Amino acid sequence: GPAPLDRILVRDRGRIFPLAVHEIEYMKADSKYTVISARGQHFLVRIGMSELEAQLDPRRFIRVHRSALVNLDFVESMRADDQSQLQIFMRDGTCIGANREASRLLREMAI
């Protein structure tokens, strides 16, 4: 397939600027929009998360549940909860719960 995207153009309050994909920390789906967290800011973009995900490197960006995608480069640590599903702690302090499928995938990736 095509090479993963390395840059996107985001609009924010009337300005448009390039955002390098490696700066994206995580993203969350919000109906037809996606909230992208990067550089300590949150950007609301008018594109569905699945559409964006299809253009990203799957070794770096992991879909942890239906409405969240994380960049492993910005994960501080992960810890299993009582249901043995992983809680993902991001470097900015955000905690995102991984579903069973993602928890299994992440465990398999661990060496």
What function would you assign to each model-found segment?
Residues 1-111:
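Basic, polyanion-interacting recognition surfaces, primarily
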